[in-house]
Structures are given as structure tokens and as C-alpha cells.
Amino acid sequence: MSIADRAATSPAAGAADAGARGAASVPAAPAGAIALPLTGERELRLDLFRGLALWLIFIDHLPPSLITWFTIRNYGFSDATEIFIFISGYTAAFVYGRAMLERGLVVATARILRRAWQIYVAHVFLFTIFLAEITYVATSFENPLYTEEMGIMDFLKQPDVTIVQALLLRFRPANMDVLPLYIVLMLSLPLVLVLMRWKPDLTLALSVLLYAVTWEYDLYLSSYPNGFWAFNPLAWQLLFVFGAWCALGGARRMQKILSSPVTLAVCFAYLFFSFLVTLTWYVPQLGHLMPRRIEQWMYPIDKTDLDVLRFAHFLALAAITVYYLPRDWPPLKSPWLKPLILCGQHSLEIFCLGVFLAFAGHFILAEVGGGAALHALITLSGILIMCGMAWLISWYKHVADKSASRKGAGGNADMAGGG
């Protein structure tokens, strides 16, 4: 179940301040920013874009080809990871902020810790299955390069030591860095919600301060056997906290700014600038057009510590998206977008499946070869499997909920943060 599942039927009282509880009385902007849904209304845009992020992450994990050119990382500074973390912060704050208001800090914290434990168990399960998949392929096809490429050589050399480091989230194979980040961010959520309920703007300012200190003093979490986390939680917390701030009234208060022609013009200009910069990465002949001083100031654009250029690129994309795609955008009810929305509603399960499928696709492409046609077939097959799994989970949950309602049992609020 995705984090947004319980938000589907949650009232506007889910906000952590009195202003958000009065959201129903605030007139909507032409296509205003994502804000707390009204009673009985689901914010399908969150599900849609988290589902899109999962598809893009899956495609980005496959070997480069013509298909990978359709992902957003090739046209700007940010990628699908920013989308996923922001929406996770938004929906988690909405669901557990409501729980904190209605049931108190202790109950809300217990539910958050339960959800963090569920994500941790999913990560360990994925680690086990993923490790077995890589080892089986490398052994069966007598190609040890798979173990080296996917980063499990240290595990095979010292399994007794490495398994402990894996349980401590310090050792991870390739493509398994998102869930550990998510776990740490969820563990910080009780403190974030307490501060948000007290002073939301100050909380966001403290998050910015931590981000700045992380950059200034090069703070990071170490990994095993050497190096550091691919996604530094001390930096990426800014995007998560910003999502929480938006969910608890910040987005609603920013509606006038976001709908301003000046804001939109600045966003479009920045997106165009970032597109021109990324163009020089793939067309070397254009490299001379980039002024040397700008290059020295801008590079490297660090993903590990969420470079400010990446953060700004995501903000520009988000501002334009929420302006031109209102909450009542008709295609949101279209059957054509239903697969994306279903994937977004069950994001934990679909992410884990996507990691498994990405290596399977990588293996097929490496062993069989082939061009764009085979790559497209593998990509489409993987996405169809992800959609099928999302539909199956949704169907099972629907049947289980109907059975529970017949017995007079209520929904499991502890699963609200799922996915």
C-alpha cells in the first residue's frame, strides 16, 4: 500500500495547523499548487507522478539506449529520485500529521516507526532476492563481471562481515540506495511533524540550515567497505521536509506566488538554461559555448548531496506542473493513466519489483545483445509486469477491505504510509 492510500479518504484536518484545516474555504487558483485534498477527494496527481518516477527509475537502471533518452535526467539537472522523495515527504506528512492531531504524538510516532520497519523489511528482502539473482546469473553464465558491476564482490569475499553491514544499511548493491534513504527520512518524521505543528516555516528554515551545514563541512554517512551513501540523508532531507511543509499548508500559501506570470517565466527560463547545459554533455561540439567561469562555478552538479541546481530544477518542474495540471485535470480519470496511478499507489512493492526486473533486463541485453528493438521490448515488458503487479495488489486490497467491512472491522491506519 502506498503512503498516499489513506490520504484518499482523509479529511482536510490532516494538516498540522489551523490554516490547513480551513483549506476548504480557500478559493483555488486556476490550476493551483498541490494542497491538502478536501474530504473524500484523492490527490491523484501525487499517485500519477510517483508512478511516473517509478517507471523512470526502472528505465534509468537499464543499460543506456534510445529508450533511456525519454527520461527527464537527459534534459535537465534533476531526475526521478527528486520526484519520489518529494512526494514521499508530502504524503507521509499528510497521513501521519493527521494521525498526530487526532491520536497524539505517541500513536503517530508508533505508526511511523511501524512503517519505517516495513520499509526496512522490504529492503532486506529485496537485498536477499537481488543478491541471489545476481549470484545465480554470474555463476550460471560463468561471468563474474556481473558481481563486480552490481557491487556485491565484497559480500562474496566476506559474507559474514558484509551481511551485518547490509543490515546496518551501510552495504548495498547497485540500484538499492533509495530505500535506505527513505528509511532514515521516515525515522526523522516524528521530529519534523512536531516542529511543523509548532512553527512550520522555522522547521523548513532549520532544514535549509542543515543542508547548508552539510555542504559547508562536508558531512556524510559512511558506507561499507569504503566511501559514503549515494544519497546523503543530511542533504536529501531538505526535499523530504519541503514536501512535508507543502502538505501541511505551505503549498496553499504559495498559490499566488506559483501562479504569478513572473514565477512561471523564471521557471521556464531556468528549465531552458538547464536543457542547454545538458545538451553540451551529449554534443561535444557545443562545449565551447559554455563560458569557463560558469563551468567552474557550476560543476560538478552533485547528486549525492542534492546540488542546489538539482533542487532548483525540481522546483521549476513542480511549479509548472501544478500550474498547468489542476487537481481536476480530466485525464486523471482516464483509463490510459490508470496504470501509472496504480503503480504510484503501491510504490514500495513496485520499486522493489523494478529493481529486480532492471537487472533481469540488463542480463538479457548483455547476453543476447540486440539493438533498440530488443531494448524497447524489455522496457515495455518490465513496465507491463509492474502495472500487472500494481493491479493485482490493488485488487487484493479491495477484496480484503470488502471482507473487513462485512465483519465490521476498520481499515488499518498503520498501513497508511505504505509504499
Segments the model singles out, each with a brief description of its role:
Residues 2-419:
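Alpha-helical transmembrane segments and their immediate juxtamembrane cytosolic regions
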